[in-house]
A protein has these predicted regions:
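Positively charged, small/polar-rich N-terminal and surface patches that mediate targeting and assembly
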Residues: 1-100
Length: 100
């Protein structure tokens, strides 16, 4: 099986729901990394006054590696369970991974 990297960028207000969903499915997700991010650009809606002043919206980025089939199942699960979560995602092949 080919491993892929699934990256999710999402509004902070849904991050806990996404993390809880991922943690509930250890059969699909071995683990993940969540970090603070900032959304920039014309596709990012700035709503709060602080966002308008700063010019970016606070986001959370979650990354996980696993078999492509599992990562696609994660996307389907997110779409079914959190249809309005406003998630941006991408999948890329993993050439190599390991622990040093």
């Amino acid at each position: 099986m080919v491993d892929v990297l699934l990256s999710l960028t999402l509004p902070n207000d849904v991050a806990q729901d996404v993390e809880d969903l991922l943690l509930s499915r250890p059969d699909l997700v071995r683990g993940f990394t969540a970090s603070v991010a900032e959304g920039h650009g014309s596709v990012v809606q700035l709503v709060e006054p602080g966002e308008l002043v700063a010019g970016h919206a606070p986001r959370t980025q979650i990354r996980m590696v696993g078999p492509e089939e599992n990562m696609r199942a994660v996307l389907a699960l997110l779409k079914a369970q959190l249809p309005r979560a406003n998630l941006f995602y991408w999948l890329v092949p993993v050439i190599e991974m390991g622990r040093l």
